Amino acid sequence: MSCLFVISAPSGAGKTSVIRTLLQTDINLTLSISYTTRPPRRDEKNGHDYFFVDHATFKDMQARGEFLESAEVHGNLYGTSRKWIEETMAAEQDVLLEIDCQGAQQIRTVYPQAASIFILPPSMEALKQRLEQRGQDENKVIERRLAAARSEISHVNRFDYVVVNHELETAARDVASIVQAERLKTIRQLVRQRSLIAEFS
């Protein structure tokens, strides 16, 4: 029985860095690559970071029901491939979704057993500094992201776990601990260790 993990955070909280660190040490975890209409950033590659598509293509895919979840974030559309998730989990591979709060709630509706993790920045000031240091956005865009962060953080009680990203390595270890604990839950071990348990019955 495979596990599905959902990680959400405000823009600038460091979730992408946490996930990259986690994936370097956990070969049994596969990151779902989302579709998006936003332009790629300087260091992003199509098919690796996102599948970059135009608005019309995204809307066509959405109309055909190809997305397990989709949402508009900061004026851009994002979606998760339904077929890819179903096939990967059917192959007994654990899946990690890096999505916004809207998408996280949609996923929980379809997969109530999914483990949801919210990554908090250590403070609003720290979040602002991180957004400024990225050098990607104008001041008005940063202010809009900070306002969105307040709204997103107000929904933190809907998540199973909360990790504060004071320091990258520590936050990544915290998330890794959550992943391991979920894998060891009885409902999953009864399936994975079926033959072992049968020896004692």
From Swiss-Prot:
Its main location: cytoplasm. It catalyses: GMP + ATP = GDP + ADP. GO terms for molecular function: ATP binding; guanylate kinase activity. InterPro entries: GK/Ca_channel_bsu, Guanylate_kin-like_dom, Guanylate_kinase, Guanylate_kinase_CS, P-loop_NTPase. One of its GO terms (cellular component) is cytosol. Its EC number is 2.7.4.8. It is found in: Cytoplasm. Residues 2-180 form the Guanylate kinase-like domain. ATP binds at A9, P10, S11, G12, A13, G14, K15, T16. Pfam families: Guanylate_kin (PF00625). Belongs to the guanylate kinase family. Essential for recycling GMP and indirectly, cGMP. This is Guanylate kinase. It comes from Nitrosomonas europaea (strain ATCC 19718 / CIP 103999 / KCTC 2705 / NBRC 14298). The lineage of its organism: Bacteria, Pseudomonadati, Pseudomonadota, Betaproteobacteria, Nitrosomonadales. The gene is gmk.
